């Protein structure tokens, strides 16, 4: 019966697939899949990780019992099965199945007696079969004791409680049943007799046996709760078990060996069947595999889908195939699977599996157009780097390191597309593959490497004899006489230290190469050790360090002082500490040979020309050639053959490939004439079905391209002028020239006639084009074509505006044109011409430009999510998944690699210049225009001549003469990687000068905490440190950065996915995986545009939908409190915000996102709840917590926050008065693309807001709608009826009365109580109908300011930006741009901050400081009028000073200032600074300089730009900063400082006013900083009055405590003025 059921089940499943796929897809690909409950966690994990890669689809997966899968007919794109289907069913239903991942089934038991024993029960196949037939029913059965003698007496005399399940043949239950049948003949017989059902077997009738759930997780839960139980589960479910009673059995396999479940044992089981797999037979099980190391209960999960179907749109199937290929090729997928005990296919099976992708056809055309190249080969750094760089949208290449001979073996069985060898090819392979071809690619040296700290930077010389004796243990110390004799110049430095020999303790090509070399050179070595892949040195040497990692020998050399071993030249170069591990020279025949490029080149040249090495004394003796091995004429797939040929040519001739090889120390085959001919001839002979596959084949002739006298274009030679012929092989002779003359004499007259006609036509066309206002430069536009919108940002060279061009949103960067010359216009034109030709997915697209002053601008694509800097600092995004961080870093490095490959260096790389589009793709911006920027810098003063210090490399800060700007960009990228790691600002709290000095002098870098190291991979931390290393040689290129980031979290083409559990501890994928495992319902992973990017973020954003309850929370009289006590109100608002959010979270509410034109945390909240009762309960608790909060004392002294008691002395009011209103209904929901926060809008929200404006502080009002839902749960008092917009009739409002706050009374309203004689109660419908509710003027007793929400914005110093008429730009500072303007008819100066995205805390502190500054009044400080607080127009408004700043006045040749007037100017400035220092609290200016001392038309001076220290610091991070000419040394050192820092600055200002010159003119940033630290000061003129000079010196004294106070400076200036007047 069961066999019939099983067959019927399989057929129905196949019908599901067969019927489900051939349906028309929707506009967006929606991928539906189902699978067994046991495979559910596997698919959820893969989908979660993959969704980071493919963002144009929606993956929906359900894990179901096998029979329930049948109900999903209309949806299925694929089915996930625990077991293969037969070849018969494949053919009948036109299906293809892909093995996805292996798993181990384990027998899991619960035995309390074994809880404290570190051992597992061991079982063999037959004994396990007996347990499942019932022949063995007790744990202490003799057969079990025999296999576990150490547990004799411990195993209990208890019945084995068996948990079984019959879920069908293609489930995990079916696999166990089949495996047991294979293990034990009696089980097979009884099982078949029972209709192939556990339930019908004899043991199932016993009370100890239970039929439990179909999923592995259900069975595991049963075991946990049942002592002495046994069942079968996936190892993935039990792997992390912490219950000491629970364990799993180890087993003897078919080969009789004891094995345990693991990645290796399952992969061994899969590999046992690789011959069948290679023959394209996937319809097989892997349990009870015959191999020595195979786990007997292994199985493979399969994806099954149709391979022939017809659809209008085939994209959905393409997505499924891309997903499958990604599982095979993505490193991150493999890592994540392994960590959760799902085992990726053995690498040798992946190529065979992936080739099945091409048999899936839609409309008789192969669905997949992408080529996947799978290759194996020797361990080498260049091939993976090449493949990473070569990978494109149509080609994905994957390389696996193994022995060279193993890779060629795989090629013979079609286990890879091509092999790579680094030690040649054994002759046997030429017999197995008759057309085997071997193409040389690049050579490298193998070198004796050592770690001897005492001789770092010096050269060590060894010879063969010494090296052999080191390996044989005859020389054990570095100061051995033989080594000293070879190194007389450094013999005194050689340490008395034991030589630690490092060798690979595994089979490796490097072992084979160096032992072969030593065996050839030394008969003793040949006899004792000989040529071998794994030398055993333990017999000869007691100081050996064995390495099990094929790439790990270099790491051991680094970690162990006085170590030695043969390693690759490129391996030494890749080590992070190159100075520590060095390469020894070799003495051969009295010649000392260094391991370098020249000796490698000579070695390869000698070999290729068959010259004996002995004839050339400068030849490195031990080298290896990397060669690609492939079938020359019998490739099975033409497209793959074409891709491989393209890769071959690319490695030899592409500049990117050449640079990569050269940087890593390789010698390219194409660099040698003989080898170049070999390469090209092999490329020409590479064929598929007798047709050459290389696009260059038709140009290759006698080992050259176009005989070296032409260029190959579109598979044909274009010859130089002196050559002709198909291959440019013929030289043009004189006779040919004569013939040519005759032909030309005939043709030219005819051609001239046609030429005249064409010229006329051309003139007409040019005329028409000219009148159509077009140019040859299609990127050139007229500025009038742009609709300029809001400001997006400001930089050192102009402003960026959001604009519209041709109906498209764009970003327009308007170049500052104040100093633009004609030469700059020309440079701008030429540079923009280059920039617009650049196209890369990770570089911001230059779309157009206007190149004429005064409107020079660049039009770029609009990046809607802003900068990476903004993202990392956005407090509304609580977590960013680690995988997403790596993805963003990878994309940025890819963009930078493209720029560097295009000959462009950035010079200002920082997180602010990495922008994100709507799909969260990172793109590099603000590069290029080097000449224009340089010219603009020359026009500026030394107050603004350097970029953002935080990201600048030390060699640039130090003004080094030879700067490699490519590596300087890498340094900047290191800081960006740190920002991604920590989400903090680099060097927070430090001034630019302090940063620069610390970076150069002290080698300071941003700190990496232990927590960060723990939470992220060590590879990522190492990459950061290498990028920002002070030694530029250590810094990697961006190509290497790409490769390393790719290795951290997957391939560059599929940059996605998970990492270790520790790496994900901060959230993201790891949590998503955990969550999905516990879910048995539908898992939907939406990959459209943005949602996938936030798998780790969205889980925090559970939001109410449908009909909801909206609550508005608002502080009344906030403006009065802000004006009364700004600091107290700042702290109170923070406290209030924290209380509201904490209680909201407790009751399941959601804080609606604030629209872009409003700021959060200003006093009003819009909260949304799914449950109305919870909403009201939260309001009650908020009121109680607000009543008992620890408010600032001064705030409580104001009537709007004072304590109030009722008649019984019960406290009813204290602190902020907060009103609350609630209403329910449907809402509109939108989502912010960056924060993923939801914003609620619509009439329900509007009505709630209106009700709130009618509510008193401390009162809670609900709408009629909400009242009708909850009137039986709370006590209400009816307030009255009011007219509400968006509501069809008058609405009745109700006040909620809570017992503890029932005596709160709100004047001005007549309450109608419907509980007769009681003081409180619940209104009911009968009373409502009685007509007692009265209309009221509810506003009668509410202050005018409280008739609006967020009354904090009604403070007198908060200005509406729309009321300001902005004029021209009049200044540009380190943190903002200054415009003149008019406000209410008054001339004002408007300083707009560069950083418009302030955090909630920053905005509150900004408000407090505004309130404080608005109270300052002095004739020598600029009057603060107010501020605008809504982005994108956050700014401060001050009085306008017509004469500009003191610097402008000093530089104006038309203004002659006498010394007396200079004293007057300085006296006024000193008075202003002294006033700031005397205020309470004291204001330290921090930036005293002439640019911040303004002058009016009457020559009165006023200090400007004081206050807002925190915002200035944040804005300075975003902008280019000036030199520290006026900065005190303690500030430069990064020490704590006081108001005396302003005194120092004023001393420099005094000198500047005295001389009219700029301090430290022509000095760069670093020189100024160091000069100030070392006591350097501007030279005081000899004719300076003595007392004045004395005061200057006192002011700029190096020690702060020896400087005068500003009060003393004022007094001294007054005395000097009096003395001068007296003399005059």
Swiss-Prot record:
UniProt xrefs under InterPro entries: A/G_cyclase, Kinase-like_dom_sf, Nucleotide_cyclase, Prot_kinase_dom, Protein_kinase_ATP_BS, Ser-Thr/Tyr_kinase_cat_dom, Ser/Thr_kinase_AS, Ser/Thr_Kinases-Pseudokinases
Domain Protein kinase: 786-1049, 1364-1615
Top-level EC class: transferase
Highest rank taxon of the organism: Viruses
Catalytic center residues: 908 (proton acceptor), 1487 (proton acceptor)
Protein name, UniProt field: Putative serine/threonine-protein kinase/receptor R831
Localization, UniProt: Membrane
One biological process term in Gene Ontology: intracellular signal transduction
Key word Kinase present: yes
Record-annotated membrane-spanning stretches: 747-767
Single GO molecular function: protein serine kinase activity
Entry-linked Pfam families: Guanylate_cyc, PK_Tyr_Ser-Thr
Glycan attachment sites: 152, 169, 200, 205, 225, 240, 245, 292, 364, 479, 541, 720, 737
Gene Ontology, cellular component aspect: membrane
Keywords carried by this UniProt record: ATP-binding, Glycoprotein, Kinase, Membrane, Nucleotide-binding, Receptor, Repeat, Serine/threonine-protein kinase, Signal, Transferase, Transmembrane, Transmembrane helix
Membrane topology: Single-pass type I membrane protein
Residues the entry annotates as binding ATP: 792-800, 813, 1370-1378, 1391
EC code(s) of this entry: 2.7.11.1
Catalytic activity reported: L-seryl-[protein] + ATP = O-phospho-L-seryl-[protein] + ADP + H(+); L-threonyl-[protein] + ATP = O-phospho-L-threonyl-[protein] + ADP + H(+)
Region (Disordered) residue spans: 1054-1101
């Amino acid at each position: 019966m069961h066999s019939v059921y099983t067959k019927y089940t399989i057929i129905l499943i196949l019908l599901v697939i067969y019927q489900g796929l051939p349906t028309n897809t929707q506009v967006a690909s929606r991928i539906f899949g189902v699978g067994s409950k046991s495979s559910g966690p596997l698919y959820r994990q893969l989908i979660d990780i993959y969704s980071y890669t493919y963002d144009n689809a929606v993956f929906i997966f359900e894990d179901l019992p096998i029979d329930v899968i049948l109900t999903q007919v209309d949806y299925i794109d694929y089915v996930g099965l625990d077991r293969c289907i037969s070849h018969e069913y494949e053919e009948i239903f036109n299906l293809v199945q892909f093995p996805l991942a292996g798993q181990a089934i384990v027998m899991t038991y619960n035995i309390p007696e074994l809880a404290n024993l570190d051992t597992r029960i061991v079982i063999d196949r037959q004994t396990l079969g007996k347990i499942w037939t019932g022949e063995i029913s007790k744990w202490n059965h003799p057969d079990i004791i025999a296999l576990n003698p150490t547990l004799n007496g411990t195993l209990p005399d208890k019945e084995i409680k068996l948990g079984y399940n019959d879920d069908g043949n293609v489930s995990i239950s079916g696999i166990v049943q089949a495996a047991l049948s294979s293990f034990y003949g009696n089980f097979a017989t009884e099982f078949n007799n029972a209709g192939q059902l556990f339930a019908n077997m004899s043991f199932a009738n016993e009370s100890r046996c239970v039929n439990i759930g179909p999923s592995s997780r259900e069975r595991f839960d049963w075991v946990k709760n049942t002592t002495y139980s046994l069942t079968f589960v996936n190892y993935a479910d039990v792997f992390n078990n912490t219950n000491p009673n629970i364990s799993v059995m180890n087993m003897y396999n078919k080969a009789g060996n004891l094995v345990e479940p693991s990645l290796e044992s399952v992969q061994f089981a899969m590999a046992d069947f690789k011959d069948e797999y290679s023959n394209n037979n996937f319809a097989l099980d892997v349990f009870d595999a015959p191999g020595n190391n195979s786990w007997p209960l292994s199985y493979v999960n399969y994806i099954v889908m149709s391979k022939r179907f017809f659809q209008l749109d085939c994209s959905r199937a393409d997505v499924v195939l891309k997903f499958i290929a990604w599982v095979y090729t993505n490193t991150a997928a493999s890592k994540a699977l392994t960590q959760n005990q799902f085992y990726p296919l053995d690498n040798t099976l992946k190529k065979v599996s992936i080739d099945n992708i091409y048999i899936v056809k839609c409309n008789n055309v192969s669905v997949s157009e992408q080529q996947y190249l799978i290759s194996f080969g020797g361990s080498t750094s260049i091939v993976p780097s090449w493949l990473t760089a070569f990978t494109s949208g149509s080609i994905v290449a994957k390389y696996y390191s193994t022995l060279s001979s193993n890779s060629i073996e795989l090629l013979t069985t079609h286990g890879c597309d091509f092999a790579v060898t680094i030690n040649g090819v054994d002759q046997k392979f030429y017999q197995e593959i008759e057309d085997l071809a071997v193409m040389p690619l690049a050579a490298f040296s193998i070198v004796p490497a050592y770690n001897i700290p005492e001789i770092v930077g010096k050269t060590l010389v060894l010879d063969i004899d010494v090296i052999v004796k080191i390996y044989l243990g005859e020389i054990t110390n570095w100061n051995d006489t033989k080594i000293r004799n070879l190194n007389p110049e450094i013999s005194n430095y050689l340490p008395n230290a034991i030589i630690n020999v490092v060798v690979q303790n595994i089979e490796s090509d490097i072992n084979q190469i160096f032992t072969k070399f030593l065996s050839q050179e030394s008969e003793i070595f040949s006899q004792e050790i000989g040529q071998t892949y794994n030398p055993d040195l333990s017999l000869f040497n007691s100081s050996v360090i064995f390495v099990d990692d094929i790439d790990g020998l270099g790491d051991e050399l680094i970690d162990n002082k006085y170590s030695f071993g043969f390693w690759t030249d490129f391996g030494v170069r890749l080590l992070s500490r190159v100075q520590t591990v060095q390469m020894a020279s070799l003495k051969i025949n009295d010649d000392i040979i260094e391991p370098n490029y020249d000796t490698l080149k000579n070695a390869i040249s000698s070999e290729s020309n068959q010259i004996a090495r002995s004839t050339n004394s400068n030849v490195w003796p031990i080298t290896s050639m990397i060669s690609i091995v492939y079938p020359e004429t019998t490739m099975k797939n033409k497209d793959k053959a074409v891709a491989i040929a393209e890769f071959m040519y690319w490695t030899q001739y592409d500049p990117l490939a050449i640079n990569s090889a050269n940087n890593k120390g390789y010698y390219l085959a194409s660099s040698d004439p003989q080898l170049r001919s070999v390469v090209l001839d092999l490329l020409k002979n590479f064929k598929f079905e007798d047709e050459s596959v290389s696009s260059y084949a038709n140009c290759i002739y006698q080992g050259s391209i176009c005989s070296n006298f032409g260029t190959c274009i579109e598979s044909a030679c274009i010859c130089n002028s002196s050559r002709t012929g198909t291959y440019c092989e013929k030289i043009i002779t004189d006779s040919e020239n004569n013939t040519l003359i005759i032909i030309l004499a005939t043709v030219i007259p005819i051609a001239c006639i046609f030429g005249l006609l064409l010229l006329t036509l051309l003139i007409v066309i040019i005329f028409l084009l000219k009148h159509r206002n077009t140019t040859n430069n299609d990127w050139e536009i007229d500025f009038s074509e742009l609709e300029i919108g809001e400001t997006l940002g400001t930089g050192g060279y102009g402003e960026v505006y959001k604009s519209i061009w041709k109906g498209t949103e764009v970003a327009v960067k308007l170049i500052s044109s104040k100093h633009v010359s004609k030469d700059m216009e020309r440079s701008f034109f030429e540079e923009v011409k280059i920039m617009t030709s650049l196209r890369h997915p990770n570089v911001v697209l230059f779309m157009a430009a206007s190149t004429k002053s005064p409107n020079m601008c660049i039009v770029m694509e609009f990046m809607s999510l802003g900068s990476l800097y903004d993202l990392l600092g956005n407090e509304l995004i609580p977590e960013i998944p680690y995988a997403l961080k790596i993805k963003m870093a990878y994309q940025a490095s890819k963009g930078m690699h493209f720029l560097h490959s295009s000959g462009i260096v950035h010079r200002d790389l920082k997180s602010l210049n990495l922008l994100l589009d709507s799909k969260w793709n990172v793109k590099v911006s603000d590069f290029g225009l080097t000449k224009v920027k340089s010219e603009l810098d020359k026009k500026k003063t030394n107050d603004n001549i350097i970029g953002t210090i935080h990201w600048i490399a030390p060699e640039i800060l130090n003004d080094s003469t030879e700067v490699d700007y490519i590596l300087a960009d890498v340094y900047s990228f290191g800081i960006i990687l740190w920002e991604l790691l920590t989400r903090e600002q680099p060097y927070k709290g430090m001034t630019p000068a302090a940063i620069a000095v610390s970076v150069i002098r002290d080698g300071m870098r941003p700190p990496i905490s232990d927590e960060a190291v723990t939470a992220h991979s060590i590879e990522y931390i190492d990459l950061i440190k290498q990028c920002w290393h002070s030694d530029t040689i250590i810094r990697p290129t961006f190509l290497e950065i790409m490769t390393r980031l790719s290795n951290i979290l997957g391939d560059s083409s599929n940059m996605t996915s998970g990492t270790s559990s520790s790496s994900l501890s901060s959230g993201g994928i790891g949590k998503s995986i955990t969550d999905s495992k516990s879910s048995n319902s539908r898992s939907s992973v939406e990959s459209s545009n943005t949602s996938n990017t936030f798998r780790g973020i969205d889980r925090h954003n559970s939001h109410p939908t449908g009909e909801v309850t909206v609550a508005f929370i608002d502080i009344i009289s906030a403006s009065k409190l802000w004006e009364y006590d700004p600091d107290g109100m700042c702290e109170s608002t923070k406290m209030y915000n924290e209380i509201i959010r904490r209680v909201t979270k407790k009751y399941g509410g959601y804080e609606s996102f604030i629209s872009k034109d409003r700021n959060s945390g200003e006093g009003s909240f819009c909260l949304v709840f799914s449950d109305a009762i919870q909403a009201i309960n939260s309001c009650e608790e908020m009121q109680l917590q607000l009543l008992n909060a620890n408010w600032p004392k001064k705030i409580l002294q104001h009537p709007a926050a004072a304590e109030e008691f009722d008649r019984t002395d019960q406290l009813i009011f204290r602190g902020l008065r907060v009103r609350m209103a609630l209403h329910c209904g449907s809402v509109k929901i939108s989502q912010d693309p960056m924060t993923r926060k939801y914003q609620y809008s619509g009439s329900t929200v509007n009505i709630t807001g209106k009700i709130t404006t009618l509510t008193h502080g401390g009162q809670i009002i609900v709408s009629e709608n909400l009242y009708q839902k909850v009137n039986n749960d709370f006590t209400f008092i009816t307030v009255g009826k009011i007219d509400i917009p968006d509501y069809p009739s008058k609405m009745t409002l109700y006040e909620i009365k809570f017992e503890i706050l029932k005596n709160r009374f709100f004047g001005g309203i007549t309450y109608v109580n419907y509980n007769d004689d009681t003081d409180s109660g619940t209104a009911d419908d009968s009373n409502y109908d009685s007509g007692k509710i009265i209309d009221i003027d509810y506003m009668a007793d509410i202050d005018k300011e409280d008739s609006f929400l967020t009354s904090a914005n009604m403070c007198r110093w908060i200005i509406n930006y729309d009321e300001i008429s902005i004029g021209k730009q009049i200044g540009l500072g380190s943190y903002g741009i200054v415009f003149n303007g008019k406000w209410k008819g008054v001339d004002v100066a408007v300083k707009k901050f560069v950083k418009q995205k302030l955090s909630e805390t920053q905005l509150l502190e900004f408000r407090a400081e505004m309130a404080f500054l608005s109270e300052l009044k002095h004739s020598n400080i600029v009057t603060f009028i107010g501020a605008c607080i809504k982005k994108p127009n956050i700014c401060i408004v001050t009085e306008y000073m017509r004469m500009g700043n003191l610097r402008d006045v000093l530089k104006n040749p038309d203004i002659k200032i006498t010394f007396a007037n200079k004293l007057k100017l300085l006296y006024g400035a000193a008075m202003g600074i002294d006033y700031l220092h005397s205020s309470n609290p004291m204001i330290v200016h921090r930036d005293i300089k002439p640019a911040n001392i303004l002058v009016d038309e009457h020559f009165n001076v006023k200090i400007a730009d004081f206050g807002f220290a925190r915002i200035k610091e944040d804005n300075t991070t975003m902008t280019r900063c000036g030199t520290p000419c006026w900065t005190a040394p303690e500030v430069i050192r990064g020490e704590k400082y006081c108001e005396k820092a302003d005194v120092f600055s004023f001393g420099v200002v005094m000198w500047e006013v005295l001389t009219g010159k700029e301090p430290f003119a022509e000095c760069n940033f670093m020189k100024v900083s160091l000069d100030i630290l070392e006591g350097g000061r501007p030279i005081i003129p000899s004719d300076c009055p003595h007392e004045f000079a004395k005061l200057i010196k006192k002011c700029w004294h190096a020690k702060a405590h020896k400087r005068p106070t500003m009060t003393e400076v004022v007094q001294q200036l007054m005395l000097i003025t009096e003395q001068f007047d007296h003399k005059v």
